[in-house]
Amino acid sequence: MMRMLKKIAGWSRKKKIIVIICVVLTLVLGATGAVFGYAASKVNKIQKIEVKKETLKESITEEVEHKSGYLNVAVFGLDSRDGSLDKGSRSDTIMIVSLNQETYEVKMVSVYRDTFMRLKDGSYNKANAAYSYFGPDGGVALLNENMDMNIEKYVSVNFNALVDVIDAVGGMDLELTDAEVVHMNNYCVETSEVTGKSYKKIEPEVGGSYHLNGVQAVSYARIRYTDGGDAQRTVRQRIVLLNIMQKLQQMDLTTINKIADSVFPQIATNFSFTEILNYAKDFQKYRVGETLGFPNVRYSKMLSGVGSTEIADTLASNVAEVHQFLFGDTDYQVSGTVKGIDDEINDALSSGKYEEADETEKEDEKSEDKTSEETNHTETNIKVTEDGNTGTDSGGTSEDSSTGSLTVTEPQQPDTETPPDYYEEDYYYGDD
Protein backbone atom coordinates (compact mmCIF):
# COMPACT_ATOMS: atom_id res chain seq x y z
CA MET A 1 0.00 0.00 0.00
CA MET A 2 2.79 2.43 0.93
CA ARG A 3 4.54 1.81 -2.37
CA MET A 4 1.28 2.54 -4.14
CA LEU A 5 1.09 5.91 -2.44
CA LYS A 6 4.42 7.07 -3.86
CA LYS A 7 4.50 9.69 -6.59
CA ILE A 8 3.42 8.69 -10.06
CA ALA A 9 5.61 10.45 -12.57
CA GLY A 10 3.94 13.31 -14.42
CA TRP A 11 0.85 13.54 -12.20
CA SER A 12 -0.07 16.65 -10.26
CA ARG A 13 -0.46 16.37 -6.48
CA LYS A 14 -4.22 16.96 -6.70
CA LYS A 15 -4.65 14.25 -9.33
CA LYS A 16 -2.68 11.74 -7.30
CA ILE A 17 -4.56 12.49 -4.08
CA ILE A 18 -7.96 12.00 -5.69
CA VAL A 19 -6.79 8.76 -7.26
CA ILE A 20 -5.60 7.54 -3.86
CA ILE A 21 -8.82 8.26 -1.99
CA CYS A 22 -10.93 6.72 -4.74
CA VAL A 23 -8.81 3.59 -4.65
CA VAL A 24 -9.02 3.39 -0.85
CA LEU A 25 -12.79 3.82 -0.84
CA THR A 26 -13.46 1.27 -3.56
CA LEU A 27 -10.73 -1.04 -4.80
CA VAL A 28 -8.63 -1.31 -1.67
CA LEU A 29 -11.60 -1.42 0.64
CA GLY A 30 -14.31 -3.16 -1.34
CA ALA A 31 -12.44 -5.99 -3.08
CA THR A 32 -15.11 -5.65 -5.71
CA GLY A 33 -13.95 -3.00 -8.15
CA ALA A 34 -11.92 0.09 -8.57
CA VAL A 35 -12.41 3.79 -9.11
CA PHE A 36 -9.74 6.01 -10.61
CA GLY A 37 -10.50 9.67 -11.09
CA TYR A 38 -8.81 12.95 -11.16
CA ALA A 39 -11.42 15.46 -12.34
CA ALA A 40 -15.02 16.30 -11.59
CA SER A 41 -15.97 15.42 -15.17
CA LYS A 42 -14.89 11.85 -14.45
CA VAL A 43 -16.35 11.57 -10.96
CA ASN A 44 -19.71 12.83 -12.21
CA LYS A 45 -20.12 9.56 -14.09
CA ILE A 46 -20.55 7.79 -10.76
CA GLN A 47 -24.14 7.04 -9.77
CA LYS A 48 -25.31 9.28 -6.94
CA ILE A 49 -27.72 7.44 -4.64
CA GLU A 50 -28.25 9.18 -1.34
CA VAL A 51 -28.95 7.59 2.04
CA LYS A 52 -32.04 9.14 3.61
CA LYS A 53 -31.39 11.40 6.59
CA GLU A 54 -34.12 9.66 8.57
CA THR A 55 -32.38 6.33 7.97
CA LEU A 56 -29.17 7.67 9.49
CA LYS A 57 -31.04 9.20 12.41
CA GLU A 58 -32.92 6.00 13.16
CA SER A 59 -30.04 3.57 12.66
CA ILE A 60 -27.24 5.36 14.54
CA THR A 61 -27.75 4.63 18.23
CA GLU A 62 -27.52 7.80 20.29
CA GLU A 63 -26.47 6.00 23.48
CA VAL A 64 -23.21 4.90 21.84
CA GLU A 65 -20.36 7.37 22.27
CA HIS A 66 -18.63 7.03 18.92
CA LYS A 67 -14.93 7.77 18.93
CA SER A 68 -13.81 10.79 16.95
CA GLY A 69 -10.97 10.77 14.48
CA TYR A 70 -12.31 7.93 12.33
CA LEU A 71 -13.99 7.85 8.93
CA ASN A 72 -16.16 4.73 8.75
CA VAL A 73 -17.41 3.74 5.30
CA ALA A 74 -19.67 0.90 4.15
CA VAL A 75 -18.51 -0.85 0.97
CA PHE A 76 -20.78 -3.16 -1.00
CA GLY A 77 -19.84 -5.44 -3.89
CA LEU A 78 -22.95 -6.02 -5.99
CA ASP A 79 -24.02 -8.68 -8.46
CA SER A 80 -26.20 -6.45 -10.66
CA ARG A 81 -27.45 -7.81 -13.96
CA ASP A 82 -29.01 -4.60 -15.28
CA GLY A 83 -26.40 -2.12 -14.04
CA SER A 84 -28.65 -0.72 -11.31
CA LEU A 85 -26.87 -0.22 -8.01
CA ASP A 86 -29.96 0.54 -5.96
CA LYS A 87 -32.32 -1.96 -4.32
CA GLY A 88 -32.78 -5.20 -6.19
CA SER A 89 -29.02 -5.75 -6.37
CA ARG A 90 -27.57 -8.39 -4.09
CA SER A 91 -24.49 -7.49 -2.04
CA ASP A 92 -22.11 -10.45 -2.14
CA THR A 93 -19.43 -8.37 -0.43
CA ILE A 94 -20.21 -6.31 2.67
CA MET A 95 -17.39 -4.46 4.40
CA ILE A 96 -16.84 -1.78 7.00
CA VAL A 97 -13.78 0.31 6.26
CA SER A 98 -12.42 2.41 9.11
CA LEU A 99 -9.81 5.08 8.43
CA ASN A 100 -7.94 6.29 11.50
CA GLN A 101 -7.27 9.94 10.79
CA GLU A 102 -4.59 10.18 13.48
CA THR A 103 -2.49 7.05 12.85
CA TYR A 104 -3.45 6.80 9.15
CA GLU A 105 -4.19 3.08 9.44
CA VAL A 106 -7.02 1.54 7.42
CA LYS A 107 -8.78 -1.46 8.97
CA MET A 108 -11.53 -3.54 7.42
CA VAL A 109 -14.31 -5.74 8.78
CA SER A 110 -15.75 -8.27 6.34
CA VAL A 111 -19.36 -9.11 7.19
CA TYR A 112 -20.24 -12.59 6.00
CA ARG A 113 -23.16 -12.25 3.63
CA ASP A 114 -25.05 -15.18 5.21
CA THR A 115 -24.97 -13.65 8.70
CA PHE A 116 -28.40 -13.70 10.37
CA MET A 117 -29.16 -10.05 11.19
CA ARG A 118 -32.00 -7.59 11.64
CA LEU A 119 -33.07 -5.53 8.62
CA LYS A 120 -34.25 -1.92 8.73
CA ASP A 121 -37.92 -2.98 8.71
CA GLY A 122 -37.44 -5.11 11.84
CA SER A 123 -37.46 -8.47 10.06
CA TYR A 124 -34.60 -10.96 10.31
CA ASN A 125 -32.72 -12.36 7.35
CA LYS A 126 -29.34 -12.85 5.78
CA ALA A 127 -27.13 -9.77 5.69
CA ASN A 128 -27.14 -9.56 1.90
CA ALA A 129 -30.94 -9.27 1.86
CA ALA A 130 -30.64 -5.75 3.32
CA TYR A 131 -29.26 -4.15 0.17
CA SER A 132 -31.46 -6.21 -2.13
CA TYR A 133 -34.65 -5.07 -0.43
CA PHE A 134 -33.76 -1.52 0.60
CA GLY A 135 -30.69 -0.44 -1.38
CA PRO A 136 -27.89 1.60 0.26
CA ASP A 137 -30.37 2.69 2.95
CA GLY A 138 -30.80 -0.91 4.01
CA GLY A 139 -27.12 -1.77 3.80
CA VAL A 140 -25.99 1.17 5.92
CA ALA A 141 -28.81 0.68 8.43
CA LEU A 142 -27.91 -3.00 8.77
CA LEU A 143 -24.35 -2.21 9.84
CA ASN A 144 -25.29 0.67 12.13
CA GLU A 145 -28.09 -1.10 14.00
CA ASN A 146 -26.53 -4.55 14.34
CA MET A 147 -22.97 -3.41 15.02
CA ASP A 148 -23.25 -0.08 16.89
CA MET A 149 -21.67 1.84 14.02
CA ASN A 150 -22.08 5.46 12.93
CA ILE A 151 -21.67 4.98 9.19
CA GLU A 152 -23.01 7.75 6.97
CA LYS A 153 -21.06 7.15 3.76
CA TYR A 154 -20.96 4.16 1.43
CA VAL A 155 -19.48 3.01 -1.88
CA SER A 156 -21.13 0.31 -4.02
CA VAL A 157 -19.41 -1.38 -6.96
CA ASN A 158 -20.80 -3.76 -9.56
CA PHE A 159 -18.87 -7.00 -10.10
CA ASN A 160 -18.67 -6.12 -13.80
CA ALA A 161 -16.37 -3.27 -12.82
CA LEU A 162 -13.94 -5.68 -11.23
CA VAL A 163 -13.80 -7.77 -14.41
CA ASP A 164 -12.97 -4.64 -16.43
CA VAL A 165 -10.25 -3.53 -14.02
CA ILE A 166 -8.57 -6.94 -13.85
CA ASP A 167 -8.50 -7.16 -17.65
CA ALA A 168 -7.16 -3.60 -17.88
CA VAL A 169 -4.21 -4.40 -15.59
CA GLY A 170 -3.37 -7.60 -17.46
CA GLY A 171 -4.95 -10.28 -15.29
CA MET A 172 -3.21 -12.06 -12.42
CA ASP A 173 -1.32 -15.23 -11.56
CA LEU A 174 -2.85 -17.34 -8.78
CA GLU A 175 -2.25 -20.73 -7.20
CA LEU A 176 -5.44 -22.82 -7.35
CA THR A 177 -6.31 -26.16 -5.77
CA ASP A 178 -8.06 -28.93 -7.69
CA ALA A 179 -11.40 -27.97 -6.13
CA GLU A 180 -10.92 -24.28 -6.90
CA VAL A 181 -10.24 -25.01 -10.57
CA VAL A 182 -13.46 -27.04 -10.85
CA HIS A 183 -15.63 -24.44 -9.13
CA MET A 184 -13.99 -21.50 -10.88
CA ASN A 185 -14.72 -23.09 -14.27
CA ASN A 186 -18.35 -23.51 -13.22
CA TYR A 187 -18.71 -19.92 -12.04
CA CYS A 188 -17.05 -18.65 -15.23
CA VAL A 189 -20.08 -19.78 -17.23
CA GLU A 190 -22.42 -17.41 -15.39
CA THR A 191 -19.87 -14.62 -14.99
CA SER A 192 -19.23 -14.68 -18.74
CA GLU A 193 -22.96 -14.55 -19.47
CA VAL A 194 -23.51 -11.59 -17.14
CA THR A 195 -20.51 -9.53 -18.24
CA GLY A 196 -20.45 -10.49 -21.90
CA LYS A 197 -16.72 -11.19 -21.55
CA SER A 198 -14.93 -14.34 -22.74
CA TYR A 199 -12.55 -16.63 -20.89
CA LYS A 200 -10.45 -19.73 -21.42
CA LYS A 201 -11.60 -22.82 -19.56
CA ILE A 202 -8.84 -24.53 -17.55
CA GLU A 203 -8.37 -28.11 -18.71
CA PRO A 204 -7.54 -30.55 -17.28
CA GLU A 205 -9.11 -29.43 -14.00
CA VAL A 206 -6.11 -29.86 -11.75
CA GLY A 207 -4.55 -27.49 -9.24
CA GLY A 208 -1.56 -25.36 -10.07
CA SER A 209 -0.42 -21.86 -10.98
CA TYR A 210 -2.62 -20.19 -13.59
CA HIS A 211 -2.86 -16.79 -15.26
CA LEU A 212 -6.46 -15.60 -14.88
CA ASN A 213 -8.32 -12.93 -16.80
CA GLY A 214 -11.12 -10.80 -15.36
CA VAL A 215 -13.90 -13.37 -15.74
CA GLN A 216 -11.77 -16.08 -14.16
CA ALA A 217 -10.45 -13.98 -11.27
CA VAL A 218 -13.93 -12.73 -10.35
CA SER A 219 -15.25 -16.30 -10.57
CA TYR A 220 -12.42 -17.41 -8.28
CA ALA A 221 -13.41 -14.70 -5.79
CA ARG A 222 -17.00 -15.97 -5.81
CA ILE A 223 -16.16 -19.60 -4.93
CA ARG A 224 -17.98 -20.71 -1.82
CA TYR A 225 -18.25 -24.50 -1.92
CA THR A 226 -14.91 -25.52 -0.47
CA ASP A 227 -13.68 -25.91 3.08
CA GLY A 228 -14.31 -22.67 4.94
CA GLY A 229 -17.43 -21.75 2.98
CA ASP A 230 -18.32 -18.06 3.03
CA ALA A 231 -15.38 -17.19 5.29
CA GLN A 232 -12.92 -18.71 2.83
CA ARG A 233 -14.55 -16.74 0.04
CA THR A 234 -13.58 -13.51 1.79
CA VAL A 235 -9.98 -14.77 1.85
CA ARG A 236 -10.10 -15.26 -1.92
CA GLN A 237 -11.52 -11.79 -2.37
CA ARG A 238 -8.61 -10.32 -0.44
CA ILE A 239 -6.15 -12.33 -2.55
CA VAL A 240 -7.62 -10.81 -5.71
CA LEU A 241 -7.57 -7.37 -4.09
CA LEU A 242 -3.89 -7.54 -3.17
CA ASN A 243 -2.95 -8.71 -6.65
CA ILE A 244 -4.73 -5.75 -8.21
CA MET A 245 -2.97 -3.46 -5.74
CA GLN A 246 0.39 -4.68 -7.00
CA LYS A 247 -0.66 -4.04 -10.58
CA LEU A 248 -1.80 -0.49 -9.87
CA GLN A 249 1.74 0.68 -9.28
CA GLN A 250 2.59 0.03 -12.93
CA MET A 251 -0.37 1.82 -14.51
CA ASP A 252 0.03 4.99 -16.54
CA LEU A 253 -2.40 7.90 -16.85
CA THR A 254 -3.75 6.67 -20.20
CA THR A 255 -4.75 3.33 -18.69
CA ILE A 256 -6.24 5.03 -15.66
CA ASN A 257 -8.33 7.22 -17.94
CA LYS A 258 -9.70 4.22 -19.85
CA ILE A 259 -10.56 2.40 -16.63
CA ALA A 260 -12.34 5.47 -15.26
CA ASP A 261 -14.53 5.74 -18.35
CA SER A 262 -15.46 2.07 -18.09
CA VAL A 263 -15.76 1.67 -14.33
CA PHE A 264 -17.22 4.92 -13.00
CA PRO A 265 -20.77 4.25 -14.30
CA GLN A 266 -20.68 0.95 -12.38
CA ILE A 267 -20.15 2.67 -9.03
CA ALA A 268 -22.60 4.34 -6.66
CA THR A 269 -21.83 6.48 -3.61
CA ASN A 270 -23.10 9.36 -1.52
CA PHE A 271 -19.63 10.94 -1.32
CA SER A 272 -19.52 14.28 -3.09
CA PHE A 273 -16.51 15.37 -5.10
CA THR A 274 -15.86 18.10 -2.53
CA GLU A 275 -15.90 15.55 0.30
CA ILE A 276 -13.40 13.39 -1.55
CA LEU A 277 -11.04 16.35 -1.81
CA ASN A 278 -11.50 17.25 1.86
CA TYR A 279 -10.69 13.73 3.03
CA ALA A 280 -7.85 13.39 0.56
CA LYS A 281 -5.37 15.82 2.07
CA ASP A 282 -3.63 13.18 4.22
CA PHE A 283 -4.22 10.10 2.12
CA GLN A 284 -0.61 9.74 1.07
CA LYS A 285 0.05 8.68 4.66
CA TYR A 286 -2.59 5.95 4.87
CA ARG A 287 -1.66 2.26 5.03
CA VAL A 288 -3.83 -0.84 4.94
CA GLY A 289 -3.86 -2.77 8.20
CA GLU A 290 -5.65 -5.89 9.34
CA THR A 291 -9.01 -7.36 8.39
CA LEU A 292 -11.51 -9.03 10.71
CA GLY A 293 -14.35 -11.36 9.73
CA PHE A 294 -17.77 -10.79 11.29
CA PRO A 295 -19.09 -12.58 13.17
CA ASN A 296 -15.72 -13.93 14.21
CA VAL A 297 -17.18 -16.44 16.69
CA ARG A 298 -20.16 -18.06 15.02
CA TYR A 299 -21.87 -21.27 14.04
CA SER A 300 -23.62 -22.40 10.88
CA LYS A 301 -27.26 -23.41 10.84
CA MET A 302 -29.72 -24.39 8.12
CA LEU A 303 -32.89 -22.40 8.79
CA SER A 304 -36.14 -23.43 7.18
CA GLY A 305 -37.23 -20.89 4.59
CA VAL A 306 -33.95 -18.98 4.89
CA GLY A 307 -31.24 -21.48 4.02
CA SER A 308 -27.68 -21.81 5.24
CA THR A 309 -26.87 -19.02 7.70
CA GLU A 310 -24.03 -17.86 9.90
CA ILE A 311 -25.18 -17.01 13.42
CA ALA A 312 -23.10 -15.05 15.90
CA ASP A 313 -22.32 -17.06 19.02
CA THR A 314 -23.57 -13.93 20.71
CA LEU A 315 -24.06 -10.74 18.76
CA ALA A 316 -22.96 -8.64 21.74
CA SER A 317 -19.57 -10.33 22.13
CA ASN A 318 -18.85 -10.15 18.41
CA VAL A 319 -19.80 -6.46 18.22
CA ALA A 320 -17.57 -5.74 21.21
CA GLU A 321 -14.72 -7.48 19.39
CA VAL A 322 -15.29 -5.30 16.32
CA HIS A 323 -15.05 -2.12 18.39
CA GLN A 324 -11.88 -3.33 20.07
CA PHE A 325 -10.41 -4.24 16.67
CA LEU A 326 -11.32 -1.00 14.92
CA PHE A 327 -11.08 1.55 17.71
CA GLY A 328 -8.96 -0.08 20.41
CA ASP A 329 -11.87 -0.01 22.87
CA THR A 330 -10.98 -2.89 25.20
CA ASP A 331 -13.95 -2.35 27.50
CA TYR A 332 -16.68 -1.64 24.99
CA GLN A 333 -20.25 -2.03 26.24
CA VAL A 334 -22.74 -2.71 23.47
CA SER A 335 -25.90 -0.65 23.16
CA GLY A 336 -29.36 -1.65 24.23
CA THR A 337 -30.20 -1.97 20.54
CA VAL A 338 -27.58 -4.68 20.00
CA LYS A 339 -28.61 -6.44 23.20
CA GLY A 340 -32.22 -6.37 22.03
CA ILE A 341 -31.33 -7.81 18.62
CA ASP A 342 -29.26 -10.50 20.33
CA ASP A 343 -32.23 -11.47 22.51
CA GLU A 344 -34.64 -11.46 19.57
CA ILE A 345 -32.40 -13.77 17.55
CA ASN A 346 -32.08 -16.19 20.44
CA ASP A 347 -35.82 -16.11 21.11
CA ALA A 348 -36.67 -16.68 17.45
CA LEU A 349 -34.29 -19.61 17.12
CA SER A 350 -35.41 -21.25 20.36
CA SER A 351 -39.10 -20.76 19.57
CA GLY A 352 -38.90 -22.88 16.45
CA LYS A 353 -39.86 -20.02 14.14
CA TYR A 354 -36.87 -20.85 11.99
CA GLU A 355 -36.88 -24.54 12.75
CA GLU A 356 -33.97 -26.25 11.06
CA ALA A 357 -34.82 -27.71 7.67
CA ASP A 358 -35.79 -31.37 7.80
CA GLU A 359 -33.76 -34.04 6.02
CA THR A 360 -36.08 -34.04 2.98
CA GLU A 361 -35.59 -30.30 2.50
CA LYS A 362 -31.82 -30.67 2.87
CA GLU A 363 -31.70 -33.52 0.35
CA ASP A 364 -33.77 -31.48 -2.11
CA GLU A 365 -31.30 -28.60 -1.79
CA LYS A 366 -28.33 -30.93 -2.32
CA SER A 367 -30.04 -32.44 -5.36
CA GLU A 368 -30.65 -28.98 -6.84
CA ASP A 369 -27.02 -28.05 -6.19
CA LYS A 370 -25.76 -31.15 -7.99
CA THR A 371 -28.06 -30.69 -10.97
CA SER A 372 -27.08 -27.05 -11.33
CA GLU A 373 -23.38 -27.80 -11.13
CA GLU A 374 -23.59 -30.48 -13.81
CA THR A 375 -25.62 -28.15 -16.03
CA ASN A 376 -23.29 -25.18 -15.61
CA HIS A 377 -20.24 -27.27 -16.34
CA THR A 378 -21.27 -27.37 -20.01
CA GLU A 379 -20.43 -24.13 -21.79
CA THR A 380 -23.63 -23.98 -23.82
CA ASN A 381 -24.03 -20.77 -25.82
CA ILE A 382 -20.92 -19.33 -24.15
CA LYS A 383 -18.03 -17.92 -26.16
CA VAL A 384 -14.89 -19.54 -24.79
CA THR A 385 -11.76 -18.30 -26.52
CA GLU A 386 -8.31 -19.77 -26.62
CA ASP A 387 -6.64 -16.47 -25.70
CA GLY A 388 -7.09 -15.95 -22.00
CA ASN A 389 -5.43 -12.60 -21.29
CA THR A 390 -2.17 -10.67 -21.48
CA GLY A 391 0.32 -9.73 -18.79
CA THR A 392 2.21 -11.90 -16.34
CA ASP A 393 2.99 -9.62 -13.43
CA SER A 394 2.31 -10.33 -9.76
CA GLY A 395 1.17 -13.44 -8.04
CA GLY A 396 -0.86 -14.61 -5.12
CA THR A 397 -1.62 -17.50 -2.86
CA SER A 398 -4.79 -19.19 -1.75
CA GLU A 399 -5.80 -21.47 1.04
CA ASP A 400 -6.07 -25.23 0.57
CA SER A 401 -9.62 -26.39 0.08
CA SER A 402 -11.56 -29.45 -0.97
CA THR A 403 -14.47 -30.20 -3.22
CA GLY A 404 -18.06 -29.29 -2.50
CA SER A 405 -21.32 -28.64 -4.30
CA LEU A 406 -22.24 -25.66 -6.42
CA THR A 407 -25.41 -24.17 -7.77
CA VAL A 408 -25.86 -21.20 -10.05
CA THR A 409 -29.43 -20.75 -11.20
CA GLU A 410 -30.98 -18.34 -13.66
CA PRO A 411 -31.67 -15.00 -11.97
CA GLN A 412 -35.13 -14.14 -10.77
CA GLN A 413 -35.59 -10.50 -9.88
CA PRO A 414 -37.18 -10.22 -6.43
CA ASP A 415 -40.10 -7.96 -5.72
CA THR A 416 -38.14 -5.14 -4.16
CA GLU A 417 -41.21 -3.13 -3.24
CA THR A 418 -42.80 -5.93 -1.22
CA PRO A 419 -40.03 -8.30 -0.14
CA PRO A 420 -40.96 -11.89 0.69
CA ASP A 421 -41.11 -13.07 4.29
CA TYR A 422 -37.86 -14.90 3.82
CA TYR A 423 -34.81 -14.79 1.61
CA GLU A 424 -34.32 -18.26 0.23
CA GLU A 425 -30.79 -19.28 -0.65
CA ASP A 426 -31.50 -19.59 -4.35
CA TYR A 427 -34.33 -17.08 -4.58
CA TYR A 428 -32.04 -14.58 -6.28
CA TYR A 429 -29.20 -15.57 -8.59
CA GLY A 430 -28.75 -18.93 -6.93
CA ASP A 431 -26.79 -20.18 -3.97
CA ASP A 432 -23.36 -18.84 -4.76
Task: Name each model-derived stretch.
Residues 3-104:
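Entry/capping segment at the start of metal-dependent catalytic domains
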Residues 56-63, 119, 266-387, 393, ...:
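C-terminal solvent-exposed extensions
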Residues 68-71, 89-94, 103-111, 122, ...:
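Extracytoplasmic
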Residues 76, 82, 114, 141-152, ...:
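Structured segments of extracytoplasmic/periplasmic soluble domains
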Residues 82-85, 125-133, 148-153, 207, ...:
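Second-shell loop/turn segments in exported
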Residues 93, 124, 128, 136-144, ...:
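Extracytoplasmic/secreted envelope proteins and their assembly/folding machinery
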Residues 133-196, 270-272, 276:
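Amphipathic, coiled-coil-like alpha-helical scaffolding segments used for oligomerization/assembly
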Residues 167-255:
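Flexible, polar/acidic helix-loop-strand segments at domain edges
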